[in-house]
């Protein structure tokens, strides 16, 4: 792959997540009954950051859970016979809560669909929102994000890479082009 552009640097990511945190609290009319669930892998640190921002300006802790969607994917046969299943840890009851699913990039909508299926198997939330750092378009399913850090129109031969300090050692969003495209 060939690097094309930096889409967001660390301060821009921070500002986008801070704005998303405010939008979540506004949409929910406060923090009552609110919880965040990060989708493996990079949705987890993003969810924790949003929760920290909410605690900063609201003075209330919002619970954060971790969701693995591996077994809910519709492309399991394409990713091999031994998919890497990771931990799902949701230390609170989902029933009656407003849940914000957090992911790094929204593309086809298939990850979000799998996350919805996994979440609903664990309880019956009052409402489910979707928050993403980057929405790159090209939906294959009728899914949209409620909270978006940045909309980035892309072509199908481009790849959006989100890097987070907790996983990758730096905060940055990059646009790459597939070779031979």
Swiss-Prot record:
Catalyzed reactions: UMP + diphosphate = 5-phospho-alpha-D-ribose 1-diphosphate + uracil
Pfam families named in the record: Pribosyltran
Keyword Cytoplasm: no
Keywords: Glycosyltransferase, Repressor, RNA-binding, Transcription, Transcription regulation, Transcription termination, Transferase
EC number: 2.4.2.9
Motif PRPP-binding: where in chain: 99-111
One biological process term in Gene Ontology: regulation of DNA-templated transcription
Cross-referenced CDD domains: PRTases_typeI
Binding positions (substrate): 41-42, 82, 86, 103-111, 136, 160
Domain of life: Bacteria
GO molecular function terms noted in the UniProt entry: RNA binding; uracil phosphoribosyltransferase activity
HAMAP family reported in the protein's UniProt record: PyrR
Family from the record: Belongs to the purine/pyrimidine phosphoribosyltransferase family. PyrR subfamily.
Its job: Probably regulates transcriptional attenuation of the pyrimidine nucleotide (pyr) operon in response to exogenous pyrimidines. In contrast to pyr attenuation in Bacillus spp., PyrR from Thermus could act as a translational repressor: the binding of PyrR at its proposed recognition site in the transcript would prevent initiation of translation of the leader peptide, resulting in terminator formation and reduced expression of downstream genes. Also displays a uracil phosphoribosyltransferase activity.
Protein name: Bifunctional protein PyrR
Organism: Thermus aquaticus
Gene: pyrR
